[in-house]
A protein has these predicted regions:
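Non-heme Fe(II)/2-oxoglutarate
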Residues: 2-95, 113
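Catalytic core of non-heme Fe(II) oxygenases with the double-stranded beta-helix
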Residues: 98-167
Length: 167
């Protein structure tokens, strides 16, 4: 088993990996190593870099971001989407149809961020980490509940290369 750093408010924890955080944080969170082959990862990186910032920082992602529908144009994105669809069915334990609506890539540089937002209307969302510099900020879940006296808390996950984070 690997361990990953997670932070709740200002307290750091080392947690076993892969992990699933239960619905006590309003939605399940699944973090696991994908073990995607190096050629596919290299191809995904190349495609994302070639597309550059097609959104002009106009979405919640204030960094270079491709178009929303890369899975409809490139087999590498489609394969990644198919895997996450299968995993979401397994995690849900319900016989529900899932489909990828949008799938895109982003490149963050120092000082860039994604602003706080929700994924209302989506049962599952996910991030796949192709490269993660050592000083990268965590993925933060805001207002997860479960804080002291009914207060909300934040929950930070520090992904590593080849991690898949589903929520």
């Amino acid at each position: 088993m690997n361990k990953r750093k997670c932070t709740v408010e200002s307290t750091d924890y080392e947690v076993e990996f892969p992990m699933t955080v239960s619905a006590t944080v309003r939605c399940p969170i699944e973090l696991r190593k994908l073990n995607l082959n190096k050629d596919t990862r290299s191809s995904l990186i190349k495609l994302i870099l070639e597309h550059g910032d097609e959104q002009n920082h106009s979405s919640n992602v204030k960094a270079d971001m491709t178009d929303w529908f890369m899975h409809t144009r490139y087999k590498e994105f489609k394969e990644l989407s198919i895997f996450t669809e299968a995993l979401s069915k397994k995690i849900s334990k319900d016989n529900i149809d899932v489909m990828t609506f949008d799938c895109w890539g982003a490149v963050y540089r120092k000082g860039e961020e994604t602003i706080k937002h929700t994924h209302w209307g989506n049962l599952w969302s996910w991030c796949y980490y192709l490269k993660v510099p050592i000083d990268s900020p965590p993925f933060r879940f805001e207002d997860i509940g479960g804080g002291e006296a009914g207060k909300t808390a934040s929950f930070d996950i520090y992904p590593q290369e080849d991690d898949l984070l589903m929520f």
